[in-house]
From Swiss-Prot:
Top-level taxonomy: Bacteria, Pseudomonadati, Chlorobiota, Chlorobiia, Chlorobiales
Magnesium among keywords: no
Function: Located on the platform of the 30S subunit, it bridges several disparate RNA helices of the 16S rRNA. Forms part of the Shine-Dalgarno cleft in the 70S ribosome.
GO process terms (BP): translation
Binding partners and assembly: Part of the 30S ribosomal subunit. Interacts with proteins S7 and S18. Binds to IF-3.
Cellular component GO terms held in the UniProt record: ribonucleoprotein complex; ribosome
Protein name, as recorded: Small ribosomal subunit protein uS11
Organism from which the protein derives: Chlorobium chlorochromatii (strain CaD3)
Keywords: Ribonucleoprotein, Ribosomal protein, RNA-binding, rRNA-binding
Length: 127
């Protein structure tokens, strides 16, 4: 069976965009989109070589957001609005890394979903 090579879709990048940071207890994912929501660049802790419990550290979060921000900066993005979701460890480190990579952070919004007493949580760990 012959392999089919697919051409990567070129995204026209505007100087304004959005950064979506999902910081869970196990991993961190950073996606940078344009104003319409089309993905410009993305990165995760696993993509940057972190394994296991090291994925949920502030340093992994810093490296992850620097990698995504550098790619978006090279494509022409300069100003971003940040949306953070989740309770992970490296939320603040991710924002500082975005600013360090040259992106100007205009707004920061926490969009972590909070239940109005929805599902019963899992039982407490006894170690």
């Amino acid at each position: 069976m012959a392999t089919v090579s697919r051409k990567k879709k070129k995204v026209k990048v505007t100087p304004e965009g959005a950064v979506h940071i999902k910081a869970s207890f196990n991993n961190i994912m950073v996606t940078i989109t344009d104003v319409q929501g089309n993905t410009v660049s993305w990165s995760s802790a696993g993509k940057n070589g972190f394994k296991g419990s090291k994925k949920n550290t502030p340093y992994a979060s810093q490296v992850t957001s620097e990698a995504a921000a550098k790619e978006a900066f090279d494509l022409g993005m300069r100003h971003v609005h940040v949306f953070i979701k989740g309770p992970g460890a490296g939320r603040d480190a991710a924002i500082r890394a975005l600013q360090g990579a040259g992106l100007e952070v205009r707004t920061i919004k926490d969009i972590t979903p909070l239940p109005h007493n929805g599902c019963r949580p899992p039982k407490r760990r006894r170690v």
